[in-house]
């Protein structure tokens, strides 16, 4: 599992494209999918926080918070863009941030309201994907996928962006994060 900063250092243009789509409306906006206790999916809109030190989310007392506390697996998808059908997707594990100084610093920096029962989670990244669609919506989207270097699920060289469905990885960062 890679932190946001490790992911961004490995593939900066892909990370910039993900950041652009998550923050296209100003603050971070996305759909967070978690795993319910019965194994089914749960999806909620959230405001992820992208900081140099990581990808975070302040989560209030809710079913999704209990999902993350019980089973940290998540998927995060960007809100639909107004000018295009471009999309970003991240998946990995969320972990509760327990360092009080770190929680306080991020809460102050990102204006978290203190009188609400929230917890701060950091999202590690196992998979990142960005898809760019042509304006007419006719051609297949240009898709790039990044797999965390320790992830054995991918073929070729994990950690390098590749087009989904290709047999060998291709380092083509320019098409998805331009």
Give the ranges of each region predicted by the language model.
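A short, Trp-centered hydrophobic/proline-enriched beta-strand micro-motif
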Residues: 22-36, 74-77
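Charged, gly/pro-rich active-site loop segments
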Residues: 1-13, 84-178
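A short mixed-secondary-structure module that forms the rim of ligand-binding clefts
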Residues: 48-83
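Short, basic/aromatic recognition patches
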Residues: 2-30
């Amino acid at each position: 599992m890679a932190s946001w900063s490790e992911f961004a250092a490995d593939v900066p243009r892909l990370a910039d494209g993900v950041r652009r789509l998550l923050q296209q409306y100003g603050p971070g906006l996305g759909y967070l999918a978690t795993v319910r206790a019965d194994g089914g999916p749960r999806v909620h809109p959230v405001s992820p926080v992208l900081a140099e030190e990581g990808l975070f989310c302040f989560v209030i007392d809710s079913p999704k918070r209990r999902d993350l506390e019980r089973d940290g697996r998540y998927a995060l998808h960007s809100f639909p863009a107004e000018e295009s059908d471009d999309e970003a997707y991240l998946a990995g594990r969320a972990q509760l941030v327990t360092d009080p100084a770190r929680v306080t610093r991020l809460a102050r920096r990102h204006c978290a309201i203190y009188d609400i029962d929230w917890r701060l989670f950091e999202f590690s990244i196992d998979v990142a994907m960005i898809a760019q669609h042509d304006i007419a919506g006719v051609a297949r989207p240009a898709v790039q996928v990044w797999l965390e270097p320790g992830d054995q699920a991918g073929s070729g060289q994990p950690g390098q962006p590749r087009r989904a469905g290709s047999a060998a990885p291709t380092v083509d960062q320019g098409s998805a994060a331009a």
